[in-house]
Amino acid sequence: MCHSRSCHPTMTILQAPTPAPSTIPGPRRGSGPEIFTFDPLPEPAAAPAGRPSASRGHRKRSRRVLYPRVVRRQLPVEEPNPAKRLLFLLLTIVFCQILMAEEGVPAPLPPEDAPNAASLAPTPVSAVLEPFNLTSEPSDYALDLSTFLQQHPAAF
């Protein structure tokens, strides 16, 4: 009894050709010679000349599908996009500028032979930036950080 892909059991019966009843009593042996020779065996003339599958009937083909081995499929290579590269470069430059920006450092002055007393005085804060200043006095955190950096210059 064989099981097909469905859950219902099926019976497969192979019909073997039945030999014609013999008139010689006793066990029947093969029709070949008793001693092995290289001579070809004579073909029986009684066999009908037809298709060999016609005598067996219609035999079902096996439904096993042979899939190829599992192969890792590779995606096609993307073409380089110059717009993406430029955007990445721009974002990298902006990120580096933000990362390395120093707050509270005055802009570098042009080099002069003799410094004036007016150039040593702190530059006044522009009126445009003043509304954005939300604290009236400098924070203690900024002072603590500057003193720490003066005491430990190799920390950063």
UniProtKB/Swiss-Prot annotation:
* Keyword GTP-binding assigned: no
Q: Low complexity compositional bias: what residue ranges?
A: 44-55
* List of glycosylated residues: N133
Where in or outside the cell is it found?
Membrane
Membrane-topology descriptor: Single-pass type II membrane protein
Q: What induces it?
A: By radiation, 12-O-tetradecanoyl phorbol-13 acetate (TPA), okadaic acid, TNF and NUPR1.
PANTHER family documented for this protein: IMMEDIATE EARLY RESPONSE 3 (PTHR16915), RADIATION-INDUCIBLE IMMEDIATE-EARLY GENE IEX-1 (PTHR16915:SF0)
Q: Which family does it belong to?
A: Belongs to the IER3 family.
Q: What does this protein do?
A: May play a role in the ERK signaling pathway by inhibiting the dephosphorylation of ERK by phosphatase PP2A-PPP2R5C holoenzyme. Also acts as an ERK downstream effector mediating survival. As a member of the NUPR1/RELB/IER3 survival pathway, may provide pancreatic ductal adenocarcinoma with remarkable resistance to cell stress, such as starvation or gemcitabine treatment.
Q: What is this protein called?
A: Radiation-inducible immediate-early gene IEX-1
Please tell me the species this chain comes from.
Homo sapiens (Human)
